[in-house]
């Protein structure tokens, strides 16, 4: 797939999500950022996992704070901002939980939480980043 010219299909997004090795939640290994890095890498062939440079909750939140928030951190990783489509990373804000990252799929966002993979309605999306340029 020419990542800069086409966009992921729903089937390829489902495949990338299902290729995630399910394991216990762990910052830097199995958290929301590691999950989106995995899916983005599977869909584009680019290594987004290299941006996961922390191994604890304190380190993760320190990086977020140093960038001025989750949105600014993701702006530094993903190039193309726009209306999220299937396979695109999204920042969501959930009641009680707060902000987290997920992958757009249909009218939902697939996120990894301390309880495993979950699908949230896309109405909670604050911002999305297009992995592929919109033509």
What positions do the PLM features span?
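Non-catalytic ligand/cofactor/substrate-binding and regulatory segments of enzyme domains
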Residues: 1-19, 115-135
């Amino acid at each position: 797939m020419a990542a800069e010219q086409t966009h992921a299909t729903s089937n390829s997004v489902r495949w990338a999500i299902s290729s995630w090795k399910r394991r216990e939640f762990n910052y830097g290994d199995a958290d929301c950022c590691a999950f989106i890095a995995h899916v983005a890498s599977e869909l584009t062939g680019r290594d987004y996992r290299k941006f996961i440079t922390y191994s604890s909750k304190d380190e993760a939140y320190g990086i977020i704070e140093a960038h001025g928030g989750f949105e600014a951190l993701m702006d530094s990783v993903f190039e193309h901002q726009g209306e999220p489509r299937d396979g695109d990373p999204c920042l969501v804000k959930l009641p009680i939980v707060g902000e987290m990252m997920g992958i757009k799929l249909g009218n939902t966002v697939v996120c990894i939480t301390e309880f495993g993979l979950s699908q949230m309605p896309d109405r909670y999306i604050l911002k999305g980043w297009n992995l592929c340029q919109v033509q």
